[in-house]
């Protein structure tokens, strides 16, 4: 895997050039995430050296972030970079943005998000 060094004030990160996008997880017949297949997909990506994982609030009818939070629990948090996006269509105030950010932290079962888009 090739990596790009991302420099910022106070340090740098080596982020894989190829990321894992979580908008198209495998689905079961009822349209929900096939968690067994999706977890296997995540494991293959991480084992291949992918360390940038991207999701968003609305992916899979809102279930991508909660699933990803559960699935990533078995990996050390410092072994991957997590990206998600602010659902701007739900934001009418700074308070809305803050509330949604806290909600996304909870959904992802993490204390921080590396890249918030």
Locations of regions flagged by a protein language model:
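Proline-rich low-complexity regions
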Residues: 16, 74, 87-88, 107
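Short gly/ser-rich anion-binding loops that grip negatively charged ligand groups
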Residues: 54-58, 87-94
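Generic beta-strand or strand-like secondary-structure segments
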Residues: 67-70, 85, 96-103
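A short, structured active-site edge motif that brings together acidic residues
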Residues: 78-90, 115-117
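Glycine/proline-rich, positively charged
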Residues: 29, 91-117
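Ser/Thr-centric signal marking residues that sit
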Residues: 55, 84, 110
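N-terminal binding-site loop/beta-alpha segment at the start of enzyme catalytic domains
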Residues: 1-80
């Amino acid at each position: 895997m090739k990596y790009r060094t991302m420099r910022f004030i106070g340090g740098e990160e080596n982020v894989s050039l190829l990321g894992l996008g979580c908008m198209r997880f495998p689905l079961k017949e009822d349209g929900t995430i096939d968690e067994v297949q999706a977890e296997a997909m995540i494991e293959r990506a991480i084992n291949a050296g992918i360390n940038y994982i991207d999701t968003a609030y609305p992916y899979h009818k809102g279930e991508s972030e909660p699933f990803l939070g559960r699935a990533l629990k078995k990996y050390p948090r410092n072994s991957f970079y997590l990206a998600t996006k602010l659902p701007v269509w739900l934001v009418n105030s700074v308070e809305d943005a803050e509330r949604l950010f806290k909600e996304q932290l909870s959904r992802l079962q993490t204390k921080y998000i590396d890249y918030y888009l």
